Amino acid sequence: FVCVQARQIDPEQILRTPEKRASCSSRGGICRSTSIGCPRRYHSCHLFHHCRSHGDSCCCPNYG
């Protein structure tokens, strides 16, 4: 996924984003496209999910 700072979010740009996998650029960044290829027991975070830390892949753990 690609994560960007909230103030840089442009909804139209989000929909045009070709990248499917990337890490967050900074703490507090936001996922702006869905991930493919997340590891087992993880799923693609929803759009605008807040990244926990630099390098977060935007794959979220499955619960339950």
UniProtKB/Swiss-Prot annotation:
Proregion residues are: 18-19
Modification after translation is described as:
Contains 4 disulfide bonds.
Q: GO MF terms on file?
A: toxin activity
Secreted recorded as keyword: yes
Superkingdom of the organism of origin: Eukaryota
| Disulfide bridge partners, by residue number | none
Cite a GO CC annotation. extracellular region
Name the keywords, alphabetized.
Answer: Cleavage on pair of basic residues, Disulfide bond, Nematocyst, Neurotoxin, Secreted, Signal, Toxin
The signal peptide, as residue positions, is 1-17
Cell location: Secreted; Nematocyst
Q: What is this protein called?
A: Small cysteine-rich protein
